[in-house]
């Protein structure tokens, strides 16, 4: 272009370019100063590379046109790829890993999912408020540090279910934050130094890599912890681990998961903490605005727990946050590059691949947009009625288009909540009234050295605040996250009425959920759902004999992924006449996207009408920024849609809406198929669970349950428990054979596993409920694996295992699955794998509650096996114990009674036969039922012979099971207890004894006395413990006849 103008800027020096023009501590402010001098577009040279900056709304509006420009990863962000690689924030344009992650994660950040995170956000925000309240109003608060703690804890808890508990360490920031701050600062430094200078900064490079590894190690630990979780929650981390890309069908690699966990932890807290810090700086600097904001919170919320509906009714708080981000965008810029050579602003030529930096602190103060007072803090300019009038792309603190921040809704809800909660609770004053704002720069910006004091408002106290938060926690959710899927009672079969078709456009799942809800409501009114599908399914396929309801939204000004074909079809102008089609449109949007608010719903509505379709009802709308989407849908349904349908399409069986029976569907329940494989199983419902041990001790649990029917159980008897395999083990199998959990497997031949023939079974159900996955491989299994091995070295190693089978495979419990993972060259069909697995068997546990103690109830006391595998790598998870540990109150499981051997029951004459019970750890279970049965006899005033319990464990505060309950039984005269503590033998009641064998020696006289009275001795525990006990007693008592010395070894 001959008339293209040279881009202005300071003259660069040889070698160093403009490096000397940049303040190393305040580089951003130096660059902003260039904007004042050189105008809306300027360039500087750093490290021999030209850097262009745009500083006006008009230029930014051009640069945000995704048909011409796409994101560029430059300077500090490019250095940050050492940490996060192709994570959402640092990926190059078009990177495949970014595409997979983006498509998987966008639905997980939909408005309904974000709203359901409000309770966890409130939990952390309450921790902050309690800390400030307990410190008192005279304490100087480093607000930026506390907001960093808050936002880091919030993102970790809400997206990954991981508690960092940063507020419990007030001395230092979390190690992740310390590493992050160094990496962000160093990335900025490296980006502004010549390559040769960076190459000689050996110590800084080494420290950089050390901090990167520390952050990746923490992310890896979070992932590993989740994979151990037997009941993972449906959160963002679960989506990362298990989500599938709808385009490629692939999941995310482990490296990509780590990259994006780190991206969330950084991007999810760093910018939000800066936003909150600047917001409160501005509020304290403008007391009249602070007062007005506080009045809005008082009028809307009062002292109630803040709900999602409250947040939608705080427009002034919303405006304050927008204005704070306008003046101090905490992520101060983003870069784009043209897809081909472009002319910018009508006069500057930008070559393809040349990055252009959008300098937000300058753009967002453009006086041509925000007026002569653009440098001043005026939230009123950001109220909805003014915000909607701004020119396109005037406010871009969250980036642009498909590379914009997908966590925007999360950050905004969190910021609204925290501002509202703090204003609800405190009056704020500056710690130093003379403080002048200083900016701390890394790749983001925050106030430096800003401190406040927080004084409790309206007579509130720290104790009262604590009590209020506990009441909220006890009473349940404060958020508007009600379950919109009402319970189906199935009292009546559905009648066939007027059919209705529903089509939706949905990226995040919100409009899809609304469509399902509306279809459910319509069914309850006598209509029949004919179709419920994405809009693209409606191309050339709109029915004419029934109403068509469309629910959709706009995504970055464009149709959602599943509505693009439909909109393109309407826009061609070649659509056949839609005459005879009756339709209604319901649109969702967010008023912050002023230029594209409801664009696609309006477009569809207009184009269908122009093509001859009949508009049944006025278009419905829901603004996600200020309302509850489901409530808006319901209101439109009642006031617009239903009246139109009744007038034009009255269903043949029209009924009134019954909220207790919304679906009017008929259903039946049956027991799981796996239950039919075992005779005599009884259904049980868990009524109570608790952990009996301290966190740093191998876990033991108590599980109480109720059941119906007579089982003829007696103290000392057993239960056969029908378990399922640990989810983490099942996931290993699915990954090994590249199966999704809901893949169907159909067995078409007879099998010994009891699998249904010619009936599809999901892969997760098959491997969870029907087969043993951790059984040691047999010799025949090894032969088959050797034959299926492609690698000669692997074949040799497998032959070595075969030759040493007993010691390496059998004794170390190496399974077929372990071998498949260890030797990837084995090519084993899944049918062959299944044929190698034995059927899943029941596991036996002792009762720990006497049937007479609480009729129709019982309990189990068990150790949860989660220990390093004997094979030398990985974890060994006990199948049944981990299954039982996953159950919660209300859970259903299945058992069958199994009598103990006759001698392992209480004496037939309890009044004349003393008993001595000896056990360690969970071996206490049967003896607890013995003692309870004796307690019942005691309460019936029946005489009892003496009973001694010798119980061994690690220590009083570690795993002294049922200490309080046993003490009560002892006080009632039912039993005398003698303890041994292996870790704390000097504890008074242990009498210096580490093991029960030692305690038997100290009580020798009492044992001899009881033995002479024809006592029965019962022993329950491990083989080693039982051998030690037997040796002591034989030495003390002589021969031990089996009718008087009864053991149960596990």
Swiss-Prot record:
The keyword Flavoprotein applies. GO terms for molecular function: aromatase activity; flavin adenine dinucleotide binding; FMN binding; heme binding; iron ion binding; NADPH-hemoprotein reductase activity. CDD domains: bifunctional_CYPOR, CYP120A1. Its cofactor is FAD; FMN; heme. InterPro entries: Bifunctional_P450_P450_red, CysJ-like_FAD-binding, Cyt_P450, Cyt_P450_CS, Cyt_P450_E_grp-I, Cyt_P450_sf, FAD-bd_FR_type, Flavodoxin/NO_synth. In the N-terminal section; belongs to the cytochrome P450 family. This is Self-sufficient cytochrome P450 monooxygenase CYP505E5. It comes from Aspergillus niger.
């Amino acid at each position: 272009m001959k008339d293209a103008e040279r881009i202005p800027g300071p003259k660069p020096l040889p070698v160093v370019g403009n490096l000397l023009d940049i303040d190393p501590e305040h580089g951003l402010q130096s660059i902003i100063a260039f904007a004042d001098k050189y105008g809306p577009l300027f360039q500087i040279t750093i490290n021999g590379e030209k850097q262009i900056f745009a500083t006006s709304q008009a230029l930014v509006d051009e640069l945000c046109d995704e048909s011409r420009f796409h994101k560029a990863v430059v300077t500090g962000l490019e250095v940050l790829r050492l940490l996060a690689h192709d994570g959402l924030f640092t990926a190059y344009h078009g990177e495949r890993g970014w595409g997979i992650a983006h498509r998987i994660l966008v639905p997980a950040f939909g408005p309904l999912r974000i709203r359901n995170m409000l309770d966890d956000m409130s939990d952390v925000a309450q921790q902050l408020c309690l800390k400030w309240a307990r410190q008192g109003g005279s304490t100087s608060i480093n607000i930026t540090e506390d907001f960093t703690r808050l936002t880091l804890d919030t993102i970790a808890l809400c997206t990954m279910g991981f508690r960092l508990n940063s507020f419990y360490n007030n001395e230092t920031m979390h190690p992740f934050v310390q590493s992050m701050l160094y990496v962000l600062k160093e990335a900025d430094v490296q980006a502004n130094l010549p390559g040769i200078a960076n190459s000689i900064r050996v110590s800084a490079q080494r420290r950089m890599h050390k901090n990167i590894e520390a952050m990746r190690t923490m992310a890896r630990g979070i992932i590993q912890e989740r994979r151990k979780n037997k009941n993972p929650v449906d959160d963002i981390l679960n989506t990362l681990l298990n989500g599938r890309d709808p385009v490629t069908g692939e999941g995310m690699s482990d490296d990509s998961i780590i990259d994006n966990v780190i991206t969330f932890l950084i991007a999810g807290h760093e910018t939000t903490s800066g936003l909150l810090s600047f917001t409160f700086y501005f509020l304290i600097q403008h007391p009249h605005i602070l007062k007005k904001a506080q009045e809005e919170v008082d009028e809307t919320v009062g002292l109630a727990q803040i709900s999602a509906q409250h947040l939608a009714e705080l427009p002034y708080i919303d405006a304050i946050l927008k204005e704070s981000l306008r003046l101090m965008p905490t992520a101060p810029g983003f870069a784009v590059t043209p897809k081909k050579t472009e002319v910018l602003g009508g006069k500057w030529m930008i070559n393809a691949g040349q990055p252009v930096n959008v300098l937000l602190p300058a753009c967002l103060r453009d006086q041509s947009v925000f007026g002569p007072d653009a440098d001043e803090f005026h939230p009123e300019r950001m109220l909805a009625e003014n915000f909607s009038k701004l020119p396109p792309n005037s406010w871009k603190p969250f980036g642009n288009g498909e590379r914009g921040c997908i966590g925007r809704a999360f950050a905004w809800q969190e910021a609204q909540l925290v501002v509202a909660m703090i204003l609800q609770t405190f009056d704020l004053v500056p710690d130093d009234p003379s403080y002048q704002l200083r900016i701390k720069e890394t790749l983001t910006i925050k106030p430096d050295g800003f401190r406040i004091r927080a004084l409790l408002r309206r007579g509130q106290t720290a104790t009262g605040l604590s009590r209020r938060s506990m009441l909220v926690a006890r009473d349940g959710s404060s958020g508007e996250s009600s379950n919109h899927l009402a319970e189906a009672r199935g009292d009546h079969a559905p009648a066939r009425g007027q059919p209705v078709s529903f089509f939706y456009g949905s990226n995040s799942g919100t409009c899809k959920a609304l469509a399902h809800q509306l279809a459910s409501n319509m069914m309850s009114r006598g209509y029949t759902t004919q179709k419920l599908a994405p809009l693209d399914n409606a191309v050339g396929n709109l029915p004419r004999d029934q109403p068509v309801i469309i629910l959709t939204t706009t995504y970055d000004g464009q149709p959602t992924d599943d509505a693009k074909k439909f909109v393109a079809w309407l826009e061609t102008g070649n659509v056949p006449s839609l005459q005879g089609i009756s339709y209604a449109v319901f649109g969702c949007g967010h008023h912050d996207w002023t230029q594209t608010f409801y664009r696609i719903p309006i477009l569809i509505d207009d184009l269908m009408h122009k093509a001859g379709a009949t508009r049944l009802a006025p278009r419905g709308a829901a603004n996600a920024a200020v309302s509850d989407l489901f409530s808006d849908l319901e209101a439109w349904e009642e006031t617009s849609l239903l009246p139109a349908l009744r007038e034009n399409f009255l269903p043949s069986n029209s009924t009134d809406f019954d909220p207790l029976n919304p679906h009017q569907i008929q259903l039946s329940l049956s027991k799981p198929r796996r239950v039919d494989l075992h005779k005599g199983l009884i259904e049980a419902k868990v009524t109570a669970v608790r952990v009996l041990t301290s966190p740093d001790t191998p876990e033991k649990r108590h599980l109480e349950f109720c059941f119906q029917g007579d089982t003829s159980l007696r103290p000392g008897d057993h239960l056969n428990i029908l378990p399922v395999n640990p989810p983490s083990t099942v996931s290993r199998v699915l990954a090994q054979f590249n199966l999704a959990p809901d893949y169907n497997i159909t067995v078409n031949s007879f099998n010994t596993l009891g699998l249904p023939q010619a009936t599809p079974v999901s892969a997760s159900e098959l491997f969870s409920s029907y087969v043993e996955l951790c059984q040691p491989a047999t010799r025949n299994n090894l032969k088959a694996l050797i034959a299926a091995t492609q690698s000669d070295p692997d074949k040799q190693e497998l032959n070595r295992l075969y030759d040493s089978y007993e010691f390496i495979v059998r004794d170390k419990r190496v399974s077929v699955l372990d071998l498949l993972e260890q030797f990837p060259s084995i090519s084993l069909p899944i049918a062959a794998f299944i044929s190698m697995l034995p059927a899943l068997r029941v596991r036996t546990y002792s009762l720990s509650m006497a049937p007479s103690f609480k009729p129709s109830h019982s309990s189990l006391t068990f150790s949860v096996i989660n220990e390093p595998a004997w094979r030398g790598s990985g974890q060994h998870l006990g199948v049944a114990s981990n299954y039982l540990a996953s159950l919660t109150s209300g859970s259903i499981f299945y058992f069958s009674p199994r009598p103990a051997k006759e001698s392992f029951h209480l004496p037939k004459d309890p009044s004349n036969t003393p008993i001595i019970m000896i056990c360690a750890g969970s071996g206490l279970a049967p003896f607890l039922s013995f003692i309870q049965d004796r307690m019942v006899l005691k309460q019936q005033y029946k005489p009892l012979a003496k009973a001694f319990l010798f119980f061994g464990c690690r220590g009083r505060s570690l795993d002294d099971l049922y200490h309080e309950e046993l003490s009560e039984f002892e006080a009632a005269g039912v039993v005398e207890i003698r303890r041994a503590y292996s870790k704390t033998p000097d504890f008074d009641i242990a009498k210096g004894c580490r093991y029960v064998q030692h305690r038997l020696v100290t009580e020798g006289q009492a044992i001899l006395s009881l033995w002479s009275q024809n006592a029965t001795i019962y022993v329950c525990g491990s083989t080693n413990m039982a051998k030690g006990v037997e040796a002591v007693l034989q030495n003390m008592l002589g021969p031990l006849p089996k009718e008087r010395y009864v053991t149960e070894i596990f």
